[in-house]
């Protein structure tokens, strides 16, 4: 819960709209399957590396439970146990594939070729053009060694324009002569040409192949293929010809004639939709055809006015056919993907229509026609992204409202518990009884968790999980729409997102999952408890999450505590024991392997073996289990590592562990699954609250008791807290064991009482201590149903809500606000602040400056007009002023040298303002070596200001000043090595100025990438715009990931300068979906650059090489 998510991206969750969260999630929902159907598809139109990077899952904490369709599937595939995803969307959103299932055996029969001889470029270059084309015509493309690799041979082969033209001519001839059963080498011809265009894109020696004018030379061949009477869906050969044409268009080019010639194929497909849509090969053919055209057109139109494109207004027949496909209606599970394709590409190609309004109306019609179905989400998204969110009526469409309404459609019911701190939103087919059971299940898990962990105080308050929200869809099918609604992965049985304090899952039948809803909830609820009460900091962030330290623990103890009971401790579940029993003895994890497991383990059995470790420690080595939890609770990485190493290296412990696994496996047949008792659901009848509290306190020997009552939708509950003082301490671990048994005995004793409400009691103990007279002492907590409603006050307590930063600097004013606090049945009459350093304040809003670095708890107490109070606290970390990280904007106060902001480094722009009474800003910078320094300060507003530069140690004599030149205050001066200050001030208080400060000539070292950064979760952070990053791709290092954040919408220019001769490029991806490529680098000599308009959010920049090795410099400019 964790350090306010470091403002990395989870901050944006509370601020961004739903449409920002789910941006581009559904736009290509059906394409992923087709992009990888054929090996040759891996080279896309303009070659962009496939970035199906699972490491993007490490941006936000999503706690995922196993999704187990059946035991064999889970046993055989890790996809049934989905790893945590830290993205927010962290979350990676998996693409939703159409129902058409891909199988290699469904590839065209023409692919088979008994001639498996291989050919290299040295041989091919020795053939005449006629010999070459005859050979190509009769072999498969993958018989040519290194076809897509740049080499001396491929350079010579494709460097011969006449040879390439001969291949194009041969393709044209095959296009005229192919039959329904003989493609005349069309697939191989197109793949050879695609290889040439691929290599031409990245290599200057073949740059002519990247010229659209040359690529247009393929158009006659394309038209010849289309004019052939066999150009239609039919035999495997005919389908493959259409597929090859689509791929070639994507790598080469097309025009309006080529596009409109595709209409008969689309029409044939639509008119036979029920027959053709389930056919993988025909679906591939149509998809490749449409996709290839769109890829070519979008590349040609990039950053250009679409109205200037030669096909603008000339492809209406094609657009109309896409419209007919998209609005086909009467869809089935087998045909839905096709209409999805139609709507998506209708939007894309509609940009070239002269009737924009008709396109938008069609998209709006799709929203209504496929109400809250996948296609409706795609249509709404395309209006938002392709048409700037403007509807056919000229007004802004409310995408957020659409998503909210969709969520209400799928989750129409809301249930509240514990004064609104436990909320369940559910589908209409999820029974109320099950909802109640889930609430009581949480209490059983909570009681056993706190016993073991020894803490029930939230590590941080004021975060989203102060209110736990659970969203339960009716079925796995409806759950899939959560991708569209909330932008999270749904290829799982359920997941918990810590920064949202929300758990998502679905109701299921035994046929759909071996785990019941309650079992899965118990697992996920444990993740909530881990985050709130045990592991400090955001999941996936910090040293505890390096090197798979806690992966086994997170998942293993979640499986363990899912077996929590009311009075029998924690029991093993049959559903988990089944895996241990089925796994062969020689395949079982060792203790060392289990303790070092992670999501990269292919079989994902560490869930089950992690459970086995937790159960082993719980049953046979509780001292180690408690020490382990203490180390985590105290963020003591060193002690935790020592515990893990000791266990890993102890052969005897491993033997005991293996024996324990066998004991668990032997219990499989007789094991059960701990679920809540029917006793929780009974009508318990009235019993006076004071009697209940008294009887519990007496039975448990408690003193200093206090009680709070909680109101829920179906019943009310109470929480009773007190102090237990026992006999002489026998040591912490013996005391723990005896206390746990005593508490279970108390619960069982109370359950024998005539009032059945005692059967709803759960209890735990925390805060172990020993008194001065050596007596053991615990804080004990009981929770149960409350039938005396008189104990529930009619006055609703106010709700305190604090807003403020999670970090600050010593001496800097920090603003805190309680404006979001509220009182539902009255008004708040006072706000009392405690800043944790001895200072206090009163008022709705407050400003405070800390004098020392440290971590402080800021607490706001609000009091309503009836005297009820509420408090909220959060942690703020105060640091000494950072003198190493470059700044990009001023921070007040900075009126004099003592308060100067900095450092300023070369290449990083610093923005500031002088408004109203703020008449001066001061910054510092360091000069690395003697020489000329230039300061440029472009501005807007009044020119009635200037700047002065002072050398450190002499604040009386300035050494330079700025002069006005073209709306910029500029100056160049000779400087010596050392620290300097620039003092910017205005001449009168009436002037308002906004400025940008740039300094050149400092000799600052450029920032360097931090290896290993070959996956997105290890991305090197680009701290500021306009910063030069030095990187290298040498030897086996083939990729580097970078990340940066955009605070305000605007254009970003990404530039990569090659320092060596090698093949390198980059692609840009949004944090919300790594598979969504926003743009890519355009090669121009040694520079690979592009400009793109970006919205606020986090982005990942992937730099990768495709030939050779070398160094580069990278800048993200704004």
Curated annotation (Swiss-Prot):
Q: What is the effect of changing residue 1104 to A/S?
A: S3b fragment has no collagen binding
Q: Which family does it belong to?
A: Belongs to the peptidase M9B family. Collagenase subfamily.
Q: Which residues form the propeptide?
A: 46-110
In terms of Pfam families, this protein maps to:
ColG_sub, Peptidase_M9, Peptidase_M9_N, PKD_4, PPC
Protein's gene: colG
Q: Where is this region: Collagen-binding?
A: 1102-1106
- Protein's UniProt name: Collagenase ColG
Q: Where is this region: S3a collagen-binding domain?
A: 886-1003
The compartments listed are: Secreted
Which species is this UniProt entry from? Hathewaya histolytica
Instruction: Tell me the ranges covered by the PKD domain, including all copies.
Output: 797-885
């Amino acid at each position: 819960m964790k350090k306010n998510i470091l403002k990395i991206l989870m901050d944006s969750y509370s601020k961004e709209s739903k449409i920002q969260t789910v941006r581009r999630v559904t736009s290509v929902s059906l394409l992923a399957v087709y992009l990888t159907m054929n090996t040759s598809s891996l080279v896309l139109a303009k070659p962009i590396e496939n970035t199906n990077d699972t490491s993007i899952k490490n941006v936000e904490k999503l706690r995922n439970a196993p999704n187990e369709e059946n035991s064999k599937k889970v046993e055989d595939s890790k996809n049934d146990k989905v790893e945590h995803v830290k993205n927010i969307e962290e979350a990676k959103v998996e693409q939703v594939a159409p129902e058409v299932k891909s199988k290699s055996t469904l590839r065209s029969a023409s692919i088979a070729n008994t001639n498996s001889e291989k050919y290299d470029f040295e041989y091919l270059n020795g053939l005449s053009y006629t010999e070459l084309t005859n050979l190509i015509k009769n072999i498969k493309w993958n018989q040519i060694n290194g076809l897509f690799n740049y080499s001396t041979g491929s350079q010579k082969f494709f460097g011969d324009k006449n040879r390439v033209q001969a291949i194009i001519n041969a393709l044209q001839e095959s296009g005229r002569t192919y039959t329904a059963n003989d493609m005349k080498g069309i697939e191989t011809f197109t793949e050879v040409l695609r290889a040439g265009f691929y290599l031409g894109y990245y290599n200057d020696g073949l740059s002519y192949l990247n010229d659209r004018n040359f690529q247009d030379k393929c158009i006659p061949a394309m038209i010849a293929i289309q004019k052939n009477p066999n150009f239609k869906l039919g035999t495997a050969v005919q389908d493959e010809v259409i597929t090859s044409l689509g791929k070639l268009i994507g790598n080469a080019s097309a025009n309006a004639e080529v596009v409109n010639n595709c209409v008969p194929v689309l029409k044939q497909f639509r008119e036979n939709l029920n027959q053709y849509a389930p056919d993988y090969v025909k679906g591939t053919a149509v998809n490749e055809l449409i996709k290839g055209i769109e890829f070519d057109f979008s590349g040609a139109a990039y950053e250009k006015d679409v109205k200037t494109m030669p096909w603008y207004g000339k492809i209406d027949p094609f657009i109309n056919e896409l419209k007919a496909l998209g609005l086909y209606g009467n869809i089935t599970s087998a045909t839905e993907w096709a209409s999805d394709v139609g709507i998506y590409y209708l939007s894309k190609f509609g940009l070239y229509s002269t009737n924009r309004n008709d396109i938008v109306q069609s998209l709006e019609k799709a929203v209504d026609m496929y109400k809250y179905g996948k296609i409706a989400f795609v249509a709404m998204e395309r209006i938002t992204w392709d048409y700037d969110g403007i509807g056919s009526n000229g007004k802004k469409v409310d995408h957020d409202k659409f998503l909210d309404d969709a969520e209400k459609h799928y989750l129409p019911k809301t249930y509240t518990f514990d004064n609104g701190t436990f909320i369940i939103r559910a589908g209409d087919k999820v029974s109320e009884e099950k909802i109640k059971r889930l609430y009581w299940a949480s209490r059983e898990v909570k009681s056993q968790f706190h016993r073991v962990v020894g803490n029930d105080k939230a590590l941080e308050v004021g975060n989203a999980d102060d209110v736990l929200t659970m969203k339960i869809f009716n079925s796995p099918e409806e759950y899939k729409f959560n991708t569209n609604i909330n932008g999270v992965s749904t290829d799982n049985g359920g997941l918990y997102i810590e920064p949202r304090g929300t758990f998502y899952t679905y109701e299921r039948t035994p046929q759909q999952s071996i785990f019941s809803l309650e079992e899965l909830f118990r697992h996920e609820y444990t993740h909530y408890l881990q985050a709130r009460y045990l592991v400090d900091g955001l999941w996936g962030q910090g040293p505890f999450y390096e090197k798979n330290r806690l992966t086994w623990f997170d998942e293993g103890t979640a499986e363990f505590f899912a077996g929590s009971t009311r009075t029998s401790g924690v029991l093993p579940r049959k559903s988990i024991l089944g895996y241990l029993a089925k796994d062969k003895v020689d395949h079982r994890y060792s203790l060392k392997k289990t303790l070092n497991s992670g999501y990269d383990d292919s079989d994902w059995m560490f869930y089950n073996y992690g459970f086995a470790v937790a159960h082993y420690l719980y049953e046979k080595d509780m001292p180690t289990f408690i020490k382990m939890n203490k180390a985590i609770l105290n963020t003591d990485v060193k002690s935790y590592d020592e515990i893990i190493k000791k266990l890993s290296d102890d052969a005897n412990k491993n033997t005991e562990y293996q024996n324990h696994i066998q004991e668990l496996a032997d219990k499989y047949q007789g094991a059960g699954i701990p679920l809540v008792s029917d006793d929780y659901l009974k009508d318990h009848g009235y019993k006076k609250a004071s009697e209940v509290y008294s009887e519990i306190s007496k039975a448990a020997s408690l003193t200093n008791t206090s009680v709070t009552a909680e109101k829920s939708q179906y019943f009310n509950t109470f929480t009773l807290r007190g102090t237990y003082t026992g006999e002489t301490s026998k040591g912490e671990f013996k005391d723990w064991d005896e206390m746990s048994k005593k508490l279970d005995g108390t619960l069982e004793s109370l359950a024998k009482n005539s009032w059945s409400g005692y059967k709803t009691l759960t209890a735990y103990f925390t805060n172990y201590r020993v008194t001065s007279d050596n007596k053991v002492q615990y804080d004990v907590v009981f929770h149960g149903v409350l039938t005396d409603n008189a104990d529930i006050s009619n006055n609703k307590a106010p709700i305190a809500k604090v807003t403020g930063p999670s970090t600050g600097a010593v001496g800097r004013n920090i603003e805190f606000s309680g404006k979001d606090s509220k009182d539902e049945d009255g008004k708040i009459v006072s706000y009392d602040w405690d800043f944790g350093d001895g200072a206090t304040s009163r008022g709705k809003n407050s400003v405070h400056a800390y004098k020392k670095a440290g971590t402080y708890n800021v607490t706001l107490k609000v009091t309503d007009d009836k005297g009820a109070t509420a408090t909220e606290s959060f942690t703020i970390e105060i640091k000494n002023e950072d003198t190493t990280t470059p700044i990009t904007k001023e921070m007040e106060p900075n009126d004099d040298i003592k308060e100067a902001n900095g450092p300023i480094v070369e290449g990083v722009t610093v923005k500031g303002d002088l408004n109203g009474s703020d008449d001066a800003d001061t910054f510092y910078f360091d000069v690395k070596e003697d020489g000329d320094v230039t300061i440029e300060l472009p501005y807007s507003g009044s020119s009635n200001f200037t700047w002065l530069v002072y050398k450190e140690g002499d604040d009386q004599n300035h050494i330079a000043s700025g002069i006005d030149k073209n709306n910029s205050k500029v100056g160049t001066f000779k400087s010596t090595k050392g620290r300097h200050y620039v003092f910017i001030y205005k001449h009168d208080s009436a002037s308002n100025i906004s400025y940008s400060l740039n300094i050149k000539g400092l000799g600052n070292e450029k920032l360097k990438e931090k290896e290993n950064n070959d996956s997105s979760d290890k991305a090197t952070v680009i701290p500021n715009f306009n910063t030069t990053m030095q990187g290298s791709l040498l030897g086996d290092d083939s990729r580097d990931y970078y990340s940066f954040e955009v605070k305000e919408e605007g254009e970003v220019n990404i530039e990569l300068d090659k320092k060596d001769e090698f093949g390198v490029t980059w692609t840009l991806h949004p944090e919300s979906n790594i598979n969504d490529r926003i743009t890519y680098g355009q090669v121009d000599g040694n520079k690979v650059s592009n400009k793109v308009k970006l919205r606020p959010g986090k982005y990942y920049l992937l730099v990768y090489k495709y030939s050779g090795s070398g160094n580069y410099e990278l800048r993200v400019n704004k």
